[in-house]
Amino acid sequence: MRRAVCPGSFDPITNGHLDIIARASKLYDVVHVAVMINQSKKGLFEVDERIELIRQVTAEFGNVEVESFHGLLVDFCKQRDIPAIVKGLRAVSDFDYELQMAQMNIGLSGVETLFVPTNPTYSFLSSSLVKEVAAWGGDVSHLVPPAVLEALNGRLKQD
């Protein structure tokens, strides 16, 4: 069985993330979406909320499993016998950083990294940008799935 992981904080998941996960789900039998837990960073959504949103928006793929992780991604991969990490690249700056991580990961554990170029429609997109635009009342409906838009608008009204 071919397995891969798509890691990230997904705070919140965007259409760019979803595009990479969808494309990975066509290449692998099982795609694990690993939601990073970063104790030093307070997210807009709790980890459990992010997991639930990702499960909702990836349900149609049928081969995506979503869970959280804390620590080294290669340890997550080793514990689950996952030989590949799938990463989307938006720009050259992403490549510079991700190449270093990929080289470290293969050196630590033999886990390969597959770089997938982002759909040009989403080349500028990040969760941080979505949160900032939405917080100022901008329309982000074309940048996130409907379930995420609803959760995002609800959360921003609370704050």
UniProtKB/Swiss-Prot annotation:
User: Which cell locations does it reside in?
Assistant: Cytoplasm
Catalytic activity, as annotated: (R)-4'-phosphopantetheine + ATP + H(+) = 3'-dephospho-CoA + diphosphate
Assigned GO CC terms: cytoplasm
Kindly list the GO molecular function terms attached to this UniProt entry. Answer: ATP binding; pantetheine-phosphate adenylyltransferase activity
What is an annotated GO biological process for this record, any one?
A: coenzyme A biosynthetic process
Q: Main location per UniProt? A: cytoplasm
Output the superkingdom of the source species.
Bacteria
Keywords (alphabetical) are: ATP-binding, Coenzyme A biosynthesis, Cytoplasm, Magnesium, Nucleotide-binding, Nucleotidyltransferase, Transferase
- Any idea which positions bind substrate? S9, K41, L73, K87
Hey, where's the site called Transition state stabilizer on this chain? H17
Q: Where does the chain bind ATP? A: S9, F10, H17, G88, L89, R90, E98, Y122, S123, F124, L125, S126, S127, S128
* InterPro entries in the record: Cyt_trans-like (IPR004821), PPAT (IPR001980), Rossmann-like_a/b/a_fold (IPR014729)
List, separated by semicolons, the cofactors it needs.
Mg(2+)
Name the protein family: Belongs to the bacterial CoaD family.
Primary role: Reversibly transfers an adenylyl group from ATP to 4'-phosphopantetheine, yielding dephospho-CoA (dPCoA) and pyrophosphate.
Q: What is this protein called?
A: Phosphopantetheine adenylyltransferase
